[in-house]
């Protein structure tokens, strides 16, 4: 697990990255009630079938089974979405299902996001993050459609957008030192190893989907799609606005 990276050459304060972290925490605490507000969560999460059809879908709660104490385990139904369904690909980026979910995501965003913002600048980083998250959501929807699974199960979390951040990170800073925790020990490895290993694990874990399994509630398609999308999106935005021929702006000294 990554703990921190080398930021000695960072030149700007990552205001947008801080904003994203604060916004995720704000939504989780005040709107999701620490993950307990199922109605809000099911209203603004991304539902693959809604994205495919372009229409809002509402369903009744369903009983999944019973607990050891005999109580029913009920899965909430899909709620009416007060916004166009395609906008849920943005709202879902700022929602999480549990403490572990948001803590893990915010740790990764804290470690890797500031470097991408420093590289792209504040506005381009904001655009990059949102585009990566949307690309990840589309990858998840495509995976669900292709495998004909989880089409009515809401997906949420910043993981897809953060996967895009990690893709851009390993593209721009492949040899940046990242300190990772392995069992009880810490060691420093280059980014291409730390992030590359994470990506390989996502691919390996995603093979469970091919066997008809649900993947443990993890949207591996979003992780893989976000990671792969983050590289070209980052490259294009980094090139955006730069002079095509910098030599033309050069003037000889007097």
Outline where the language-model segments fall.
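A detector for small-residue-rich transmembrane helices and their helix-helix packing motifs
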Residues: 1-254
